[in-house]
């Protein structure tokens, strides 16, 4: 299990995310976990705390469910937009499954292409992009390119539920495979197809194969460069979010092992929805659930003794809107003290 390069030994047991706020070299922070454990609430709250310490913060949702708009009560889209009430916190929601057509189309309807009826463009597209994950990889690379040009000091990713979270790590390989396939097609059939399809080409946006190759190569370079940063613990860390239940703990352990195998730093776990029944409480369900949660909390502390483990309470209301998010975010840096 990895630990951050600049986190000092004295801070390792601190039950907060303060070490992440203090680590000024961080540029990329990923927040991930199983569905329904409070990832979006945690990533929004972390971004709010970072905005107090950094010049500019960008919060990006790559979860197709797009909960950022719901959390802040404000509509976000593909373009970065300032969050109401903040001068240095922006947010955007992107679809990681965006299609190749969206990326390459220049706004011309396919029906206007005289060759569209022959299906030549579609055939080339199907051949070139038959490798699984190419759409997603190119969409992600486009986002990274956009994010890099915007030059935010720190970027927080509210990721899709585990299973999709770590896909971006395989994208350079996926793009390399697609490039190799396209190069092969280009050398074998390129001149012939380009002449058949005419100057406008048969690919979306009227591009020919060489232009498409150049575009994919530039995207591959971007994604490879950023992936190098992802593996640098001074620049990137991953915050795991879970609840104190078996399946969530199992998923967290699997995710941490996968992150470690990719050399991605992780040293913080946020445990959400913890019950703190008052002493002498006669709520049978509350006490039974607390007992179960206590068992898994002990396992978390034993398994991840060199992690910052943050304990967050189950609240009586949904955490939605600026005020509630700010209140919740305070508990990420100041440990929650349950009422006696």
Swiss-Prot record:
Compartment(s): Cytoplasm; Endoplasmic reticulum
Active site per UniProt: 63
Annotated GO biological process: cellular response to oxidative stress; pheromone-dependent signal transduction involved in conjugation with cellular fusion; post-translational protein targeting to endoplasmic reticulum membrane; response to heat; response to metal ion; retrograde vesicle-mediated transport, Golgi to endoplasmic reticulum; tail-anchored membrane protein insertion into ER membrane
Pfam families named among the record's database cross-references: ArsA_ATPase
Alphabetized GO MF terms: ATP binding; ATP hydrolysis activity; guanyl-nucleotide exchange factor activity; identical protein binding; metal ion binding; protein folding chaperone; unfolded protein binding
Binding site for ATP: 34-41, 245, 272
Presence of the UniProt keyword Transcription regulation in the record: no
Residues binding Zn(2+): 283, 286
EC numbers, comma separated: 3.6.-.-
Main location: cytoplasm
Keywords: ATP-binding, Cytoplasm, Endoplasmic reticulum, Hydrolase, Metal-binding, Nucleotide-binding, Transport, Zinc
InterPro entries named in the record: Anion-transp_ATPase-like_dom, ATPase_ArsA/GET3, ATPase_ArsA/GET3_euk, P-loop_NTPase
GO cellular component: GET complex
Keyword Heme recorded: no
Record's subunit section: Homodimer.
NCBIfam families: GET3_arsA_TRC40
Function as written in the Swiss-Prot or TrEMBL entry: ATPase required for the post-translational delivery of tail-anchored (TA) proteins to the endoplasmic reticulum. Recognizes and selectively binds the transmembrane domain of TA proteins in the cytosol. This complex then targets to the endoplasmic reticulum by membrane-bound receptors, where the tail-anchored protein is released for insertion. This process is regulated by ATP binding and hydrolysis. ATP binding drives the homodimer towards the closed dimer state, facilitating recognition of newly synthesized TA membrane proteins. ATP hydrolysis is required for insertion.
Family: Belongs to the arsA ATPase family.
Protein name, UniProt field: ATPase get3
Gene designation: get3
């Amino acid at each position: 299990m990895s630990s951050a390069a600049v986190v000092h030994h004295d801070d390792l047991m601190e039950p907060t995310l303060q070490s992440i706020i203090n680590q000024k070299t961080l540029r990329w922070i990923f927040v991930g976990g199983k569905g329904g454990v409070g990832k979006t609430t945690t990533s929004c709250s972390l971004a709010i705390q970072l905005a107090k310490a950094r010049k500019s913060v960008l919060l990006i949702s790559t979860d197709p469910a797009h909960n950022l708009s719901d959390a802040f009560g404000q509509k976000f889209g593909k373009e970065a937009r300032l969050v109401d009430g903040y001068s240095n916190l922006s947010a955007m929601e992107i679809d990681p499954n965006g299609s190749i057509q969206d990326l390459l189309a220049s706004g011309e309807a396919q029906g206007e292409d005289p060759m569209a009826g022959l299906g030549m463009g579609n055939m080339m597209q199907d051949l070139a992009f038959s490798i699984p994950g190419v759409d997603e990889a190119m969409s992600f690379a486009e986002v990274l390119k956009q994010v890099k040009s915007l030059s935010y000091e720190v970027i927080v990713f509210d990721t899709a539920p585990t299973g999709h979270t770590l896909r971006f790590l395989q994208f350079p390989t996926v793009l390399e495979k697609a490039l190799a396939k396209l190069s092969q097609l280009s050398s074998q059939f390129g001149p012939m197809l380009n002449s058949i399809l005419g100057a406008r080409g048969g690919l979306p946006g009227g591009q020919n194969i060489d232009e498409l190759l150049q575009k994919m190569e530039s995207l591959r370079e971007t994604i490879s460069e950023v992936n190098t940063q992802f593996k640098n613990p001074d620049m990137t860390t991953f915050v795991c979010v879970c609840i104190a239940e078996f399946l969530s703990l199992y998923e967290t352990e699997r995710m941490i092992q996968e992150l470690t195998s990719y050399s991605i730093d992780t040293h913080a776990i946020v445990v959400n929805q913890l019950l703190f029944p008052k002493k002498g409480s006669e709520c049978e369900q509350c006490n039974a659930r607390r007992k179960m949660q206590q068992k898994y909390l002990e396992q978390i502390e034993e398994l991840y003794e060199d992690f910052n483990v943050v304990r967050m309470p189950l609240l009586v209301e949904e955490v939605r809107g600026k005020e509630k998010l700010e209140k919740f975010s305070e508990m990420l840096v100041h440990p929650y003290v349950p009422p006696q």
